[in-house]
Amino acid sequence: MTKSELIERLVMKYPQLRAQDVEDTVKLMIERICHTLEKGDRVEIRGFGSFSLHYRESRQGRNPKTGESVRVPAKSIPYFRAGKELRERVDEEINQ
């Protein structure tokens, strides 16, 4: 599901809400999560999951085109860990 599809589905499910308000809210939520991660903080949405940063050390890599060794710099990457409730719901739905 894309962000646009999420907005469409929310508008269909809640017709009393204006489409622009739904779009603004979804964009604002995503922006706040990104901003919090940029500060190095963790975001937890109970029952859904948590967003955090995982640090990756600098390492030796290889350019797939040329085969040349290159140094990959250290970096922090966003990481999502599904919460228990979400994992159980998905598992239950798939195993029916």
From Swiss-Prot:
SMART domains: BHL. Pfam families: Bac_DNA_binding. GO terms for cellular component: chromosome; cytosol. GO terms for molecular function: DNA binding; structural constituent of chromatin. GO terms for biological process: DNA recombination; regulation of DNA-templated transcription; regulation of translation. Keywords: DNA recombination, DNA-binding, Transcription, Transcription regulation, Translation regulation. It comes from the Bacteria. Belongs to the bacterial histone-like protein family. This protein is one of the two subunits of integration host factor, a specific DNA-binding protein that functions in genetic recombination as well as in transcriptional and translational control. Heterodimer of an alpha and a beta chain. HAMAP family: IHF_beta. PANTHER family: DNA-BINDING PROTEIN HU (PTHR33175), INTEGRATION HOST FACTOR SUBUNIT BETA (PTHR33175:SF5). NCBIfam families: hip, PRK00199.1. This is Integration host factor subunit beta. It comes from Dichelobacter nodosus (strain VCS1703A). The gene is ihfB.
